[in-house]
Amino acid sequence: MIKIVDYGLGNIQAFANLYKRLHIPVVVARTADELAGATKIILPGVGAFDHAMARLNESGMREILESLVQKDKVPVLGICVGMQMLANSSDEGVLPGLGWVPGRVREFRNIPGLEGIAQPHMGWNDVKPVVSSGLFKGLETDARFYFLHSFFFECQNPDYSLASANYGLEFSCAVANRNVYGVQFHPEKSHDFGMTLLKNFSEI
């Protein structure tokens, strides 16, 4: 069963509605007991990195989430700030991330040459898979997704990058490390492209 982690941040209902349209059952988990037994996990998130990490830590679900993902190797998909939470740390805050995909979250304007770039990066952008992955099955060419963010994932090792987009520089907009996946864009706002990606995740 796919379970969506509801720790108070993220457009939970949008994901539930999309999976309903795909005729794929999901459960919204608000407690550790509700999250237990998940065979796939979606970790959404919006807002600031530290606020998201603090809310997750306070939710009572951090321990079971760590156990499911790290011990039982349950596939997890972090979305938007949920992807950023997979990193070790962020320019945006002081709290440590989950550290499941080694890397740091950087602000576009902190990159030399991008000090004056408009933030946030908002709207549709091309997404180019850089390696073959089941997450992007059927999305290998001409895929476009909706973005809304001012920070991006800088992988410690380029092998963790699944797909890239360009906004002043080429950046990793999708990452993976074994059973851990993350996407910076919003599949729930990306129409057929997003539905395809969420269906693909259900089949990983």
UniProtKB/Swiss-Prot annotation:
GO terms for cellular component: cytoplasm. Pfam families: GATase. GO terms for biological process: L-histidine biosynthetic process. InterPro entries: Class_I_gatase-like (IPR029062), GATASE (IPR017926), Imidazole-glycPsynth_HisH (IPR010139). GO terms for molecular function: glutaminase activity; imidazoleglycerol-phosphate synthase activity; lyase activity. Residues 1-204 form the Glutamine amidotransferase type-1 domain. Its EC number is 4.3.2.10, 3.5.1.2. It catalyses: 5-[(5-phospho-1-deoxy-D-ribulos-1-ylimino)methylamino]-1-(5-phospho-beta-D-ribosyl)imidazole-4-carboxamide + L-glutamine = D-erythro-1-(imidazol-4-yl)glycerol 3-phosphate + 5-amino-1-(5-phospho-beta-D-ribosyl)imidazole-4-carboxamide + L-glutamate + H(+); L-glutamine + H2O = L-glutamate + NH4(+). It comes from the Bacteria. It is found in: Cytoplasm. Its main location: cytoplasm. Pathway: Amino-acid biosynthesis; L-histidine biosynthesis; L-histidine from 5-phospho-alpha-D-ribose 1-diphosphate: step 5/9. Keywords: Amino-acid biosynthesis, Cytoplasm, Glutamine amidotransferase, Histidine biosynthesis, Hydrolase, Lyase. The active site is at residues 80, 186, 188. IGPS catalyzes the conversion of PRFAR and glutamine to IGP, AICAR and glutamate. The HisH subunit catalyzes the hydrolysis of glutamine to glutamate and ammonia as part of the synthesis of IGP and AICAR. The resulting ammonia molecule is channeled to the active site of HisF. Heterodimer of HisH and HisF. This is Imidazole glycerol phosphate synthase subunit HisH. The gene is hisH.
